[in-house]
Swiss-Prot record:
Organism: Bacillus cereus (strain ZK / E33L)
GO cellular component: cytosol
Free-text function comment from the UniProt entry: Is involved in L-lactate degradation and allows cells to grow with lactate as the sole carbon source.
Database matches in InterPro entries: Cys_rich_dom (IPR004017), LutA (IPR022822)
UniProt GO BP: lactate metabolic process
Protein name: Lactate utilization protein A 2
Pfam name, any one: CCG
Amino acid sequence: MKVSLFITCLSDVFFPQVGRSVVEIMNQCGVELDFPEGQTCCGQPAYNSGYQEDAKLAAKQMIKAFEHSEYIVTPSGSCASMVHHYYKEMFKGDSEWYEKAVHLADRTYELTDFLVNVLGKNDWKSKLVEKAVFHQSCHMSRALGIKEEPLKLLSQVEGLDIKELPYCQDCCGFGGTFAVKMSSISETMVDEKIKHIEATEANLLIGADMGCLMNIGGRLRRKNKNIQVLHVAEVLAKGLNK
């Protein structure tokens, strides 16, 4: 099996450790991994801001970059949902690119979805002794319907005590450009999220979308809260029995 890594903008620029963790995970699974260098932004920021033609240019570049990939795996439910749902919307009426968009969507997987539903991982052997909560991101849980897969994997991590997070599926207030355009509302939403995290007395927040982690983690730092923030890939890669 050969897998191509779709790294995403946030991992490339802000969370390189997440990309490295995905590589470690795939190596542990015995999966051959490559990195198509032609990949770029999936186009979601442009699409959500109304710049349809710019989004199409990004989508076409992504389609070309992963044209020959058997599987495409990304550590982002948000970017995966863009490829799955909105590429097809953008290219409706364009038979050539619509078919290519469908072909790309059919081969693109969010990381935990791939590990559980393609590789069938049910005996993950890593260790992390922490009391934690898991934040369900909007695009991943609603757009892709991926809810149990990350929790199933985290339940296999030795020493990890996952507490139930109240209102775990409530938006953290990031929403891409929403956090910029509606900053006061976004701030209220993330403060509410932090209140629920603190109520669990957890010292670790785990998520599967880096936009959420950047938003919540940044707010935690500004409020001087001693709560660590990790991507699910980082947790799975910690203490691997290599």
